[in-house]
Amino acid sequence: GDKVMPRTAEWESRWWSPIINAEHLQMRETAGIVDLTAFAYFDITGPSALAVVQKAALRQMDVAIGRVVYTPVLGPNGGFKSDLTIMRLGESHFRVVTGGAHGMADKKWFADLLPEDGSATIKDITSDYTTLGVWGPNARKIVQEVTSADMSNEAFKFSTCKEIDIKGVKVLASRISYVGDLGWEFYVPMADGPALWDALWESGKNHGMIPVGIGVYGTTGRLEKCYRAYGPELETEYTVVEAGMQTPKLKDADFVGKEAHVKHRSEKPAAMLCTLFVDDHTSSTGEKRYMMGNEPILTLDKQPITDSHGRRSYVTSAGSAPSLG
C-alpha cells in the first residue's frame, strides 16, 4: 500500500522492486519462508575439533551441545575475515554455516587451522544440504502444527539447535534470525528439501505466510535490526570494536587476531559503525533519490569526514525500512 514507495530514478531502481517491501511487510505481520539453499556448510570433527573452532572464532566455542554461536572470524590484524554461525552438534562435532559467496574462503581458513596429526578433519557438505527459514510473528504456530517437538520459548530457546521431525522429515532446526523476527532455520539433506517446503507451506497458508526473497532476508529485514554483513559492514580494514561487536568479556582461549583485538579493546576507536535514518530523500532537482551503499557521508558544508587513520566515512549498506515508515 502506501508504505511501498516507488523509485523513479533508473540508477537506484536496478536491483530494487516494490515486491521486496510488500514481502517484508507481510513477513512482519504474519510470516515468511525463505529459500537459503545458497548457504555453505562444513563439519569439523575429531578430538581436536574444539581446538580448531576456538582458534578460528572470536566468541567462546566451548559451549553446551546444542548451542548455536554467531561469531566474527578475525585475521592477524584483528580485522574481519568473516562472520558466521557455528553449531555444536556433539562433543567433537561442530557445523559451520556461512554465506555461499564466501564459503570456499571460510572453508580454507578453517582447513588451514587443522592440526597436522589428523586429530580433526573438515568435510564440506554444501552440496548435500539445503536450508529453509521461517520467520515472523506466526512462525511458531506454523512450525508447531507440523511437528510433535515442543517449539515453545521455554523448550526451544534462542541460539540453540536440535533435531526434530517435520511430517516425517528429519530436520536440524536452529533458532536464529537474520531478519529480526521469531523463527528458525531448518537444515535437511537436499533430497528432503521439497518435502520440507511442502509441509511448512501447507501449514503456513493457514497463517498468512508467503515466500520471501533475499531482498528481505539480506537487506530490509537485517537493516531494520541493524544487523551487519560481511563485506559492507565487516571488513579487514575495520576492527570488532569499531563495528560495535566486542563482547563484554574476552575468552581465555587463544584465537587468530587475539593480540591485535586486545589492543583494539584498550584504545578509543577511530571510527564507529552507526545507523542513519534518512527521512527526506528529495534531491536538489526535486526528484526522490535513494542510497545503494558506498556513498560518501559529508558534513553540512559538504566536506568529507575523515578519521585518524585517513579513512573517509561512507554508507556501508542502504535499503528501505518498511516497518519503520
Q: What is the predicted function of each stretch?
A:
Residues T45, L74-P76, L298-K302:
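A generic structural motif
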Residues K55, R59-L113:
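Well-ordered mid-protein domain cores that form the structural environment of catalytic cofactors
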Residues G1-W15, L89-G325:
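Conserved, structured C-terminal
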Residues I33, Y41, P72, T85, ...:
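Conserved hydrophobic/aromatic beta-strand scaffold that supports enzyme active sites
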Residues D35, D83, E185:
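Acidic active-site catalytic centers that drive phospho-/nucleotidyl reactions
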Residues G1-T71, G79:
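Acidic, proline/glycine-enriched N-terminal capping motif
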Residues P47-F80, A139-V169:
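Internal amphipathic helical hairpin motif
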Residues H24-M27, F39, A56, Y70-V73, ...:
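Long, contiguous hydrophobic alpha-helical segments, chiefly transmembrane helices and signal peptides
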